[in-house]
């Protein structure tokens, strides 16, 4: 209880008094800041007859830091209320610069002389509730009153206790009994099956016998108390799935109310697709309880979060909607905490998407997802969105398969790069929409590329300092390969951040790829398409055109495309991966496809067209590259190593370790070859078996001709293990060794600091067989040494000790 002495003392020293009257540490939809939306807030009340100038006063959550947030010049009228929002990184000086933890905390108010004026120690508060004063007593408020007096009729003593339930979420047999227990005899339990806040008609008075899959939401009520926080459970009965399962517990009216439900057309929808004006086009969030189960129905993640309908013109109007899952700071758990994607070692995500397939809905339903997974597995240098197909339930009712994906936003950068999401610049489309941060730096990059000749290395290097060029190339090549005609003017994002200043592209939405856009060959030539006048004003294409003026970049671009056509873009490899992904979800499509799309047979047919596109793509691209860059047609070459296993090879951007390697490249566009010799082997030369040409450098550049076969030729180390006696020795040792081929020999002795202290060469050839050499060590100081025996084929080492 607040002391009257405290108020009197403050009036005496400051000529007025004020009180921290109410606090809301988890504001979702109660009080909206005009500039920043729904933020935590605190209310100050002036209980005096005089107006107050708050300048010089301060708020803090740290008693030892009384000036943490100073009030700006604000006059608070007599008996008036001032509501102040809070944000950890505010833009306006009128916003408190720290947050209020929902689990409880203390906020202090200090005078200009750092004297404590007031404080409020608040307990854990549920979202949208507040805690404040009525007649010097603190109450909980289910209906906060920012800017107005607190109402004793709406004040509560606290919260009822959440009921306990005997069984956690999972799979159970028919007839299993669910028992709920109140913590106190004065508390009554209510529950619902449709995700709605339970009402009095759903009174719990006896165990529930499971007869079907159920999603239960339960609360407890008590006199003078706010209803307890909800408890959620999902019980699967006679369910069997080969994919992980997501259940979304949600007030069914929030989704399906004809007037207000976010899944529905609503009263203002245009009659024809994509039904602009429909409820599902609104950026409206609703609260849900999210649960994620593995295929054994074991609960692996669960949290309160928000959802909103997700996607563009090709997605939102579909019968099954894409849903964005949004972790919120207002709840106990802000991040989805599980390793959802096998392809990435990540286990924290602020946002996830349950995607319907977008433009691929009721086709393969997985095209974009399968391509992303494949390119991640292939190690391409692009920011890609991992994929995990899941079976979705809503309030315990089967809904269908959706593609769980990473969200292409600033929190993707946080999860994948461990960077501050508030320091990310994320731009969208050809128009460089500022999704987050600012476009200033990227506009400067575009202007520089357009205003300077990048054929000059000085200018090219400046762009290279601003742009991750290797990633830029891989990003463009993926889009060009799949022939994505919903790009590059749309479905494009690029980012940089403090700590990662080079711009990178974030790839998403290839739904319209892997199919023909017309009947003729030019319609499939995607590089020629983006370089023509149709997209000439696109800044991303302008950067590519500027870079292509540089001879080194142009050679890299062509060779990288060829490298990928020979590996990651290989038709057999891509379609094998798509087939694996198809097989992974096939057992579930028998329920999903008829529910939403029609005959399951038509689903299988969708993959025939994809295979036809993939099978013909390499030839089309080779033809296009030759045409665009005025090159001869591609030629076939082979890379090999002799003897087998003696070396690996770096071919342009490819690290080769399996031989022979066969690929296609362009004559007049030089390729790079580097031999990387394994330990115990000696490099002799590169040999072109077609021409018998030999090159004696490890790193070479060659102009490929048809049927070239470049081979790394090596010698194995043919020295048998050496034997030294006596060892330790005083003055003389005998070195015994065997050779499998004739060779000159050199013996050297090195001290432990690496200094050569003794060396003897034997230029005459030692024949194949066993040999002995006597050595005088009398000139050496006592100690430990390393003896090296070197031949034309290798080197062996052994430790010796001089007494």
Please tell me what each predicted stretch does.
Residues 7, 16-63, 99-103, 120-125, ...:
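A structural motif detector for short, solvent-exposed N-terminal "entry" segments of globular domains
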Residues 104, 211-215, 668-670, 707, ...:
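Extracellular Ig-like/FN3 beta-sandwich strand-entry sites
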Residues 66-92:
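Intrinsically disordered, low-complexity Pro/Gly/Ser/Thr-rich segments with frequent PxxP/GP/PP motifs
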Residues 47, 95-148, 303-315, 586, ...:
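Conserved beta-structured recognition patch
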Residues 19, 74-78, 84, 125-295, ...:
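Short, compositionally stereotyped local motifs that mark structural "simplifiers"
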Residues 147-155, 244-272, 277-283, 288-289, ...:
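Middle-to-C-terminal accessory/interaction subdomains
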Residues 716-739, 750-755, 782, 800-803:
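Surface-exposed, proline-anchored Ser/Thr-rich loop/turn motifs
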Residues 773-774, 782-803:
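C-terminal tail/sorting-segment detector
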